[in-house]
């Protein structure tokens, strides 16, 4: 009888499931397929419900022939005060580091607590426009492919293909104003992508739409590698981290002079348009930071306080981690994203184990045939605003290095800033938070009390960068100094806004003096009749309405089927109870024992994705790397691989799990490649991998 009842229950369930209408978004081209409706802690910690952003996420196929999928996570304000048809693409660096750092540690609406639940980030950029975090190049984060790319022109090519596929999902957004933002090695990615978009816009064919690129924002960017490294010794000296009486000063000064010779050589051939090995190879200059971190150890301090944090000189860390155990909340992000339920909630089709950085991606991506992105800035500045913002406490991509390469750069008819001492105070929420130099469509913004990751330290201040680049600020005289004044979200005074409107005759200000050919970054409040929330789902609304009648009819059929089945069950049960009791015999002891023994046996069943995870966990890692082994992602290599692709290995060595953006290994001067440390907590047995991997040394790329 139990078997009959079980069979009937399964039959009922099968009928119900088969009678249900197709799940919304089952069409691979439907945006609803990528809708994210739940996450751990979402409805408990993010209140009220109308403050929960509209989210889409998933692994979007861009090149089926190589099984290349880019993971994206999009956030839109579900309750916007004003409709702004604006899209912000955010990229982290590495190369090979996931943009989920940006989403969950910096500019996204969530942070992750120690219970691996989402909590609010009140400085989220999604209040300023739709923001999309993309794991790229392929192999980074949740993105995957059969091949890895090697050069910056490929980064641009792949990202434009991603944009093409993205706008197929969200066609109503193709006319939105576009901004790119990111940090660190994204200082190489973003200029290349922006340049490719501008070139594409000049060669549109029938049926193609212009991408309305309005500006780029690069935070603590690795834009001019050798020039940046030349700033390390002056930075340490200026901030009291070393002085001329240090016993290693002469050694450091000699290396600094070697780096200066390389930079001089780069300067002499800067405009010839040729990729020179001495410019794309930066190991000599980067070795200065390695030595500085070693020589300035405070061996008398506690073990975890001996080394300067290279991402924030005001902090300390163990040696040789020197900042790899930071940011501290990173230990929550990995376990959160590795939860299988979270992977399903993010609509993953490949349940790939997330790691902050993938060393194989970084080592394959050598950029040997790509001129550093600093060469692209002048052309970009002819058409769009270029904003370079820096946390003042950062060492590895410090402000001195940025100003140094800008002062040599020629753009829009002049060299450098004509008066870099003419600094504009930046006032946010009645406090001076930094200073601005803005001329001819390139701006430099130095932000006080912040690190390599400005939005991590000052999320609300960083969000106001969007106000600066879009002209949503007030110019005032504060304490006798020219100041740009921005405000917390929604608190800009009506009188100030009105005065600003009169002064600018209805248009937004453009900071600095833009050339005549510059596209002004005018981002006005849209008068569109629907919000981005509504438009994101508009493509599916019609089909949902057309299905409403059939859905009601289907439910009636379901109800009828259920009633018939329950009636049948009742008849069987009544027939069973009416049988003579003498027919029903108790089993013998032997039979009972056999039955119990048989019933007590259970099959050990594992899901396929569990087996995949076990295979991932059993993969061995490469030998440990050199001293910083995690600090600056170098754009180097030895083999001519332009336009070629590196196949992804299967089995052992498929995934190289690594740590923070901008890793480097400089222990061997003959080795010139990207090196970073492991971030896989489970495989390395560390709460955070930086301290576990400082002795790793990378083999040269073949």
From Swiss-Prot:
Catalytic activity: Preferential release of a C-terminal arginine or lysine residue
Keyword field contains Glycoprotein: yes
Chain spans, region Disordered: 491-548, 582-603, 660-702
Record keyword Hydrolase present: yes
Localization in the cell: Golgi apparatus, trans-Golgi network membrane
BP term (GO), one: symbiont-mediated cytolysis of host cell
Domain of life: Eukaryota
Gene expressing this chain: KEX1
Group of enzyme by EC: hydrolase
Transmembrane segments: 556-576
Main location per the UniProt record: Golgi
Membrane topology term: Single-pass type I membrane protein
Matching InterPro entries: AB_hydrolase_fold, Peptidase_S10, Ser_caboxypep_his_AS
PANTHER family: PHEROMONE-PROCESSING CARBOXYPEPTIDASE KEX1, SERINE PROTEASE FAMILY S10 SERINE CARBOXYPEPTIDASE
Start-end of Polar residues biased regions: 587-598, 692-702
Active site residues per record: 184, 394, 452
Signal peptide boundaries: 1-19
Enzyme Commission (EC) number: 3.4.16.6
Organism: Candida albicans (strain SC5314 / ATCC MYA-2876) (Yeast)
GO cellular component: membrane; trans-Golgi network
GO MF, one annotated term: serine-type carboxypeptidase activity
Functional description taken from the UniProt entry: Protease with a carboxypeptidase B-like function involved in the C-terminal processing of the lysine and arginine residues from protein precursors. Promotes cell fusion and is involved in the programmed cell death.
Lumenal compartment spans: 20-555
Ranges of compositional bias, category Low complexity: 524-548
Membrane topology, Cytoplasmic segments: 577-702
Protein's UniProt name: Pheromone-processing carboxypeptidase KEX1
Family listed: Belongs to the peptidase S10 family.
């Amino acid at each position: 009888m139990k078997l009959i009842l079980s069979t009937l229950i399964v039959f009922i369930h099968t009928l119900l499931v088969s009678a249900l209408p197709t799940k919304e978004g089952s069409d691979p081209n439907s945006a609803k397929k990528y809708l994210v409706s739940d996450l751990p802690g979402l409805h408990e910690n993010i209140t009220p419900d109308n403050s929960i952003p509209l989210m889409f996420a998933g692994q979007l196929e861009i090149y089926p022939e190589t099984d290349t999928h880019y993971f994206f996570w999009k956030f839109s304000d579900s309750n916007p005060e004003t409709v702004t048809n604006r899209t912000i693409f955010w990229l982290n660096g590495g190369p090979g580091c996931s943009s989920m750092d940006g989403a969950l540690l910096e500019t996204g609406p969530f942070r992750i607590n120690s219970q691996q639940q989402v909590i609010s980030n009140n400085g989220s950029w999604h209040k300023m426009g739709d923001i999309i975090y993309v794991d790229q190049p392929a192999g980074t984060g949740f993105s995957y492919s059969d091949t890895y790319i090697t050069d910056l022109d490929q980064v641009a090519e792949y990202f434009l293909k991603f944009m093409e596929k993205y706008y197929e999902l969200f066609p109503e957004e193709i006319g939105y104003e576009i901004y790119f933002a990111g940090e660190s090695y994204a200082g190489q990615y973003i200029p290349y992508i922006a340049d490719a978009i501008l070139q594409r816009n000049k060669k549109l064919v029938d049926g193609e739409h212009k991408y309305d690129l309005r500006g780029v924002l690069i935070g603590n960017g690795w834009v001019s590698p050798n020039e940046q490294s030349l700033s390390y010794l002056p930075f340490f000296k200026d901030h009291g981290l070393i002085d001329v009486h240090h016993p290693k000063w002469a050694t450091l000064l000699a290396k600094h002079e070697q780096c200066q010779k390389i930079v001089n050589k780069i300067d002499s051939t800067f405009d010839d348009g040729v990729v020179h090995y001495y410019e794309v190879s930066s190991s000599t200059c980067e070795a200065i930071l390695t030595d500085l971190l070693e020589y300035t150890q405070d061996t008398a301090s506690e073990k975890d306080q001996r080394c300067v944090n290279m991402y924030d000189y005001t902090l300390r860390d163990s040696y040789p981690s020197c900042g790899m155990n930071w940011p501290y909340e990173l230990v929550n992000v990995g376990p959160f994203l590795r939860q299988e339920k979270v992977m399903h909630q993010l609509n993953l089709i490949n349940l790939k184990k997330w790691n902050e950085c993938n060393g194989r991606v970084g080592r394959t991506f050598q950029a040997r045939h790509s001129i550093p992105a600093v060469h692209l800035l002048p052309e970009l500045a002819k058409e769009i605003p270029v904003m370079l913002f820096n946390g003042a406490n950062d060492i590895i991509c410090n402000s001195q290095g940025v100003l140094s390469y800008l002062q040599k750069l020629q753009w829009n008819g002049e060299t450098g800033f004509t008066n870099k001492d003419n600094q504009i105070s930046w006032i946010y929420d009645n406090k001076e938070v930094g200073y601005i130099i803005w001329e001819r469509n390139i701006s430099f913004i130095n932000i006080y009390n912040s690190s390599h990751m400005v939005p991590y330290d000052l999320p609300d201040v960083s969000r106001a960068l969007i106000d600066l680049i879009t002209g949503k600020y007030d110019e005032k005289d504060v304490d006798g100094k020219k100041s740009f004044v921005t405000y917390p979200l929604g608190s800009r005074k009506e009188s100030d806004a009105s005065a600003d409107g009169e002064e600018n005759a209805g248009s937004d200000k453009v900071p600095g003096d833009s050339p005549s050919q510059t596209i002004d970054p005018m981002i006005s409040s849209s008068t569109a009749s629907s919000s981005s929330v509504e438009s994101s789902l508009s493509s599916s609304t019609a089909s949902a309405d057309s299905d409403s009648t059939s859905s009601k009819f289907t439910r009636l059929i379901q109800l009828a089927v259920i009633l018939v089945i329950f009636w049948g069950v009742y008849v069987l049960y009544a027939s069973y109870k009416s049988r003579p009791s003498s027919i029903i015999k108790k089993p013998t002891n032997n039979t009972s024992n056999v039955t119990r023994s048989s019933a007590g046996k259970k099959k050990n069943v594992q899901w396929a994705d569990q087996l995949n995870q076990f295979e991932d966990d059993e993969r061995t890692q490469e030998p440990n790397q050199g001293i910083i082994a995690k600090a600056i992602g170098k754009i180097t290599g030895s083999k001519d691989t332009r336009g070629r692709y590196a196949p992804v290995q299967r089995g052992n060595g498929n995934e190289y799990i690594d740590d923070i953006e901008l890793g480097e290994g400089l222990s061997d001067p003959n080795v010139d490649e990207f090196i970073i440390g492991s971030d896989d907590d489970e495989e390395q047995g560390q709460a955070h991998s930086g301290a576990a991997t400082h002795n790793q040394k990378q083999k040269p790329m073949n």
